[in-house]
C-alpha cells in the first residue's frame, strides 16, 4: 500500500481563546485531488497554511512525509516587488540556474594555465549530473511555455504594478514550475485559475 504524503492527527489551532481548528485528522495519498469547502472564517486558509508549513498547530500532529515537497498559492501571494515578472518566475529555478552559471564559469576558469584542472573537471562532472537530473539545460524554453500558458503580463513588467489576479497568475506560474509534490491552492474559485493549475 502506498504511503501517505501528508498526515494530520487531532490537530488544534487556537489564537488565545479563539479556536480556529479543533481535532482535525486527515491523511492524503500522493496524487489525491481534494477540496476543502466551507463558509468564510471557518479556518480553511489556516488549515492550508499549516499543511504548507507556514503555521504550526497548537496541539496534535501535522507532518509532511520526509522526501516530499509542498507549495502553496496563497490568496495574497508573496512576490518580490523589486523584480519583474520574469525575474519572479525564474526564481523557481534558482538553484539550477546557479549550477548552470557555475558550470559555465568553470569553462572560463579552465582557460587559466595555472588552474587545478582535475578539481575543475570533477566539479564540472558533478554539476552536469545534477543539471541533467533537474532537466535544467532548457530553462528559458520552459519559462516561455509556462508564461504563455498562464497568459502572464509582459515579462519585463514590474510585479508591483500588477493587479491581484495577475499577481496570482505569476505566483501560480512560479509554483507550478517548482513542481511540489503537494500543491495547495487557497481560494482557487475562478475556473480559469483551476484550469491553469492542471495545464
Language model feature labels by segment:
Residues 1-187:
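ABC ATP-binding cassette signature C-motif
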Residues 188-199:
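Single conserved hydrophobic/aromatic residue that forms the stacking wall/gate
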